Amino acid sequence: MFTELLFIVSFVLLLRLFKSSRSRMIIGVLYSLLLVWFIFSVLNYGKYTLQPGQSVNLRVNPRTQDLEYYSIFILKKNDSGRIKLTGSSVWSERNGDVYYGVEEQKIIKSHGLDEEDEELPNKQVDIYLEKDGVVVSYQGEKVFDATNNKPYTITITNVDKKPAQFEAQVVDK
């Protein structure tokens, strides 16, 4: 809100200050380019293309000052390339019953309080464990639980042989 207001006020003040048509045309072109750049950057927020071996870091800053807080990590993959997620010791889908324990190297399916948990083999097609994270190769959108009581960084690395395109976002509520 403040950025838009500053943009409009400075534009009006500059137009009032410069009276020649050439100056006003230059100001109009520069502000139009700035507006196009701003809209383009807002529309592409959270969209990434990583070459093989490249990484991107996303910061999780939990709102621990709130009584009820949680963080989610939204990952929408546009292709079936493999990317590795590191930074958390346990990965799980939001409201899911399968937990990927990175430190223990175990995939656990929870059956609630009544039954005993079941250990699944590490041969899942879409998501599987590696020594320091989980590798995901699904196509589509998944929401992971990223709640923790301390800030940390999620690192996304392209471990495939081709470029990977995805959208990633951390939401702290």
Region locations from a protein language model:
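Internal/C-terminal transmembrane anchor helices
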Residues: 24-45
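Edge beta-strands of jelly-roll/beta-sandwich modules across compartments, strongly enriched
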Residues: 81-84, 160-172
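Extracytoplasmic/periplasmic/luminal assembly and interaction segments
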Residues: 62-121
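Short, solvent-exposed mixed-charge patches
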Residues: 1, 172-173
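Beta-sandwich interaction modules
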Residues: 60-64, 113-149
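Alpha-helical transmembrane signal-anchor/signal-peptide segments
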Residues: 45-63
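Membrane-embedded alpha-helical segments of integral membrane proteins
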Residues: 1-17
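Noncatalytic modules at the cell exterior or secretory-pathway interfaces
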Residues: 65-72, 145-160
